[in-house]
Amino acid sequence: MNNFFLLVSTWPVTVKPRGLGTSKNLTGQYDLQLSNKSLALVRKDTKEPMIELELISVRRCGHTDCFFYMELGRSAVTGAGELWIQVDDQIIAQNMHEAILG
């Protein structure tokens, strides 16, 4: 079995103070990194990974305007809840949604 991770995409994002952003103290600016198995929020200032979420823990996701959101299940390291992420424009939010679903 092959256990390596392949980085697919990286987006500059801002986690908003809503849902898990507040309850897990995740609000702030990050790079959201998508690999073939997970999503990682990497702090802009320290370049340190804050959390890594397995893709199988994402129950559903979507986008509206300049926001991308994910509903995470109980198996996520954060526990169940929503994560709201702001990006620079609507097209980026749509691209994130399509890439993560793919």
Label each region the model flagged.
Residues 1-52, 56-67, 71-102:
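N-terminal recruitment modules of adaptor/scaffold proteins
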